[in-house]
Amino acid sequence: MARKSFRVTMRKRKTSGGTKEKFTRKTNTNVRTNTKAKTKTPTAEMRARHKQQMKKVSDEAAAVIALKTICADSGVCIAFGYAQDKIKTYFKRFLDFRLVQSSRRIGEVSVNGFVFELAYKRKHYTSYAVLKNSANQGADNLVYEYVVGKYIDLEYSKYFPCLIETYGLFRYTNVQAYENAKQSSKLEFKSLVHIPERNGAVIDVDTFKWSCIDSRQHCILTQHLKGVISLGDVMSGKARLKNEMEIVYILFQVYYFLFHVRKDFTHYDLHEGNVLLFEPEKGKKIKYKYKLSDGKLISFESAYVVKIIDYGRCHIKMSDKFYKTLGMYCNPNQINSQGYPWFNKPGMYHINALEPNVSHDLRLYSRVKTSNAFPALQTLKPCIYTCEFGTSEIQTNNKYPQYIGNITDCLNELTTTIQQNSKGSIKTQNTIHLAHIQVSGDAPMRIRYLKAE
C-alpha cells in the first residue's frame, strides 16, 4: 500500500504583537502521533526462525564443549588420528575459508614451492592446515600429489600414525593470481577455486587438462601440526632429540609403515626434510606398541609422533591407471615439462612412479646413518645406496648379511636394536604418558588418549 506524503507547510498569521509564522504538519495517517512505537506481534514464522537460530547457536556451543572435552588441543588429536572426523566435520572439512582467522607464509619460496599456514577458528576452537604451492612448472605436479594423498587417506591413514591427511585441491583463478600469492605474505582466498570430487572421481577431465597446461596454478590443502620440526632440523643442529634412542624409534615408525605397504607404495623422495616430528605435549610421552610379522609385540616410549610428507613422486597401486588417463589429455612434452617426469621409464635416479622399489626409500636411513649425528646408529649395519638420490632395487632379503639392502632388512635391524635396548634399559615409574597407540599393520590402529579420560 502506498504511503501518503509527509510535508511541512508554513504561513503567516497576525497577532497583537505582530506577524508570526505558523507551522502546520500533514502527516502520514498510518503513523502514530504518540511517542510510543507500535509493537509488532511476532508471527509463527518469526518464532520458528528465532528458535532455529537459537538452536544453531546452542548446537555450536555444545559441539565446542564436546571437542574441548575429548581434545583440548586439536593438533594433538589430529596427530594421533583421534576424534579426527569430529574435528574435520566441525571445521567443514577445512574447505570453508570463511572459518580462516589468519594466514601467513611459512618460510621462503624454494625449489620445492611455497606454503601458507591457515589458522581456522570457530567458537574459541582452533585448528590448522597448510596450502602447498608449486614454485614453477617443472616442480612435482600437485594434482598427482593430491591423488596420492587421497589414496593414502583411504587406504592407509586408519592403520598407521605416520601419515598426513590431504583435504582438498584448489586452482588459482589465473596466472596473475598465482604470481600475487607467490610474492605475498598472506593469502587472498577470493583468488582460489575449490575443485570438488565429482561422481566419486577424485579429479575430472578438466583438471587433467589444466595440470598439463600450467601446473603452477594448482595447490593442495593438507593437514598441519603447528610447532613441528623436521628430522633435517635435528641433523643440522637447529633442534635436538630428547635422548639418543629417539632416532631409532623415529626410523622404526617410518620403516614399519614402508614394510607393510612395500608391494604397493614407494615414496621416492624420502629424506630428512620430508620427515616431521611433532611433540604433542612437553614432558609427556606416547607409548607405542607394534605388532611384528611373527605376531609378537614390540613396545617403546617416544616424545614424538612422526609424519611423512610430500607425496608428489610416490608409486601407488593406481599410478598406472593415472598415467594412462594422463596420456589421453597430455602430450609427452607436457608430461615432461609440467611436473610428471617420474612416469618415464627407466626413470631418473631409479625413480619410476609406475613401479615399486623396495630399496629406494633407504635414502633416509642412508643419510641419517652416514651423518654421524646420532650415536645410537653407530652400531647399526650400513645400507647399500648407489647414488645420492636413488638406488637400484635389491628384492632378496638379507642378500648381503653385513648390509641393509631393502626396507625389510632395515626394519629387522631397527627391531633388533629396540629389543636389545629394552633388555638393557632400566624401567622408571616416573614417565607420564599422554597416549597409548597400538599398530598392527593389518587392522585399524587403536588409540587411547589419556587426557580425554
What are these regions (language model features)?
Residues 164-244:
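Conserved structural core of kinase catalytic domains
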Residues 72-125:
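ATP-binding glycine-rich phosphate-binding loop
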Residues 50-63, 319-324, 334-453:
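Helical subdomain adjoining the active site within ATP-dependent kinase catalytic cores
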Residues 117, 130, 134, 178-182, ...:
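Short coil/turn segments at secondary-structure boundaries
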Residues 1-49, 54:
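Arg/Lys-rich, intrinsically disordered low-complexity tails that mediate electrostatic binding
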Residues 112-174:
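ATP-binding glycine-rich loop module of kinase domains
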Residues 271-356:
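Catalytic activation segment of kinase domains across protein kinase-like and atypical kinase folds
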Residues 152-153, 238-268, 272, 278-282:
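Conserved kinase catalytic-core helix
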